Swiss-Prot record:
<dbReference type="InterPro" id="IPR001412">
    <property type="entry name" value="aa-tRNA-synth_I_CS"/>
</dbReference>
<keyword id="KW-0436">Ligase</keyword>
<comment type="subunit">
    <text>Monomer.</text>
</comment>
<feature type="short sequence motif" description="'HIGH' region">
    <location>
        <begin position="122"/>
        <end position="132"/>
    </location>
</feature>
<dbReference type="GO" id="GO:0006420">
    <property type="term" value="P:arginyl-tRNA aminoacylation"/>
</dbReference>
<dbReference type="GO" id="GO:0005737">
    <property type="term" value="C:cytoplasm"/>
</dbReference>
<dbReference type="InterPro" id="IPR014729">
    <property type="entry name" value="Rossmann-like_a/b/a_fold"/>
</dbReference>
<keyword id="KW-0963">Cytoplasm</keyword>
<protein>
    <recommendedName>
        <fullName>Arginine--tRNA ligase</fullName>
        <ecNumber>6.1.1.19</ecNumber>
    </recommendedName>
</protein>
<keyword id="KW-0030">Aminoacyl-tRNA synthetase</keyword>
<dbReference type="InterPro" id="IPR005148">
    <property type="entry name" value="Arg-tRNA-synth_N"/>
</dbReference>
<dbReference type="InterPro" id="IPR009080">
    <property type="entry name" value="tRNAsynth_Ia_anticodon-bd"/>
</dbReference>
<keyword id="KW-0067">ATP-binding</keyword>
<dbReference type="InterPro" id="IPR008909">
    <property type="entry name" value="DALR_anticod-bd"/>
</dbReference>
<dbReference type="InterPro" id="IPR035684">
    <property type="entry name" value="ArgRS_core"/>
</dbReference>
<keyword id="KW-0648">Protein biosynthesis</keyword>
<dbReference type="GO" id="GO:0004814">
    <property type="term" value="F:arginine-tRNA ligase activity"/>
</dbReference>
Amino acid sequence: MNIQALLSEKVSQAMIAAGAPADCEPQVRQSAKVQFGDYQANGMMAVAKKLGMAPRQLAEQVLTHLDLSGIASKVEIAGPGFINIFLEPAFLAEQVQQALTSDRLGVSQPTRQTIVVDYSAPNVAKEMHVGHLRSTIIGDAAVRTLEFLGHHVIRANHVGDWGTQFGMLIAWLEKQQQENAGDMALADLEGFYRDAKKHYDEDEAFAERARNYVVKLQSGDTYFREMWRKLVDITMTQNQITYDRLNVTLTRDDVMGESLYNPMLPGIVADLKAKGLAVESEGATVVFLDEFKNKEGDPMGVIIQKKDGGYLYTTTDIACAKYRYETLHADRVLYYIDSRQHQHLMQAWTIVRKAGYVPDSVPLEHHMFGMMLGKDGKPFKTRAGGTVKLADLLDEALERARRLVAEKNPDMSADELEKLANAVGIGAVKYADLSKNRTTDYIFDWDNMLAFEGNTAPYMQYAYTRVLSVFRKADIDEQALASAPVIISEDREAQLAARLLQFEETLTVVAREGTPHVMCAYLYDVAGLFSGFYEHCPILSAENDAVRNSRLKLAQLTAKTLKLGLDTLGIETVERM
């Protein structure tokens, strides 16, 4: 149930009846303060201006046409023309009852779309580091949300699996007589990569051999393709362990690396030339874009093929967007890539649109994100100043969580303790990131993320177990509870019910904007409202069975909402803490 959408429709009809144009925006929003009701319609200002009348006068006319019987208990005009809507307790009770009868908690399904989500994108022959964390977990939260809403989601892990580095790696492996790459751990590959790069920079004969190997690899030579495949396999096997630890839904089947688009690049360049979009400039093939200016104020040149015939990331990204529309039949494409790549993507997509590869009706969206910083406000590094490996970060999270939960649960079995530490430790790392607006940088702080107070994973996981504890203490007749009516008579019951019923609205925002922090804020709010409700509205010691059962049902919907909401974020819940 999307109450905001229902009210928007009703207010819009009333505005049109009051003389507003058919495309008027009612601007119905969740109210920021209790005294302004549950929702507020703010659209009178803009429409009144167009009609040449006072906003309050328009609001008064709208009210004469607004029928919210059975939905609102009170509707009032505030200030210059805001319309405050207070929901009817009986309406809230009915919607809570309906939500409890559905596994989806009453969340409706939008028109199904095919949505491609590009996220994670590690590089072959390198271990994942903290720089991969944000794309991986924010992208996965978007995927989970879109799938829950009923969309057909295609995960696209745009792995860096092509380029000159493979000539270096294969040449170095061969030099070391270690062609049997399948037996190597990825940590070895990291060392091999460093050594290969050193030799490439210092030994011209080695560099020449590496360049020849790239040519052979690109021409499809069987031996070199096999060596390349081994490197990819080792990397993705290791990455899968990290994905599984992070409770991320990516699998090997989702890999759509740069190599996938390689065969398409000559055709792309030829087509852009034929369409008059690409021209020769100083030996390279370039697309000049009026939409982007260089320092001199001239159209910026975007190279799509170098003098030596090599292609660039832009060329690959053009082919990639074309493939996602033509072959994957995407209705929408989301890219979870850091903010530093924004101009690069905008240039590639401008070319894509000009060439007619993807129509304007199919959105290409850069859901960019900021950086993870250390407490000093600089990019997060090891003490020695090196890049933090993701596996090491997760190991430390687990170790810290182990100490934390062991302290609080001295009698818990070793198995239970390990499960709980894993849920808390990994959950803390993910939630600390997901709860921040993705567009900003954020400070990575162990103490904050593992705290049991505030908007953290441990607090949210504890809040969930606290609701469950009510049911453990109660001697509940499941059948009697299922058939019991919901009664909303106290303010705190109404506030909790109204917020619980905004779950669909929250999911809709996350799906549209790709902002999981909105879900985190919502769940934190629900947990806080339940805490106030629990304190002021006795459940197990309620004045009679009818009130007790009704409050148990509110607790039941709270538990289900917290669990489902955390699941869309990829955060595990636990039964005990």
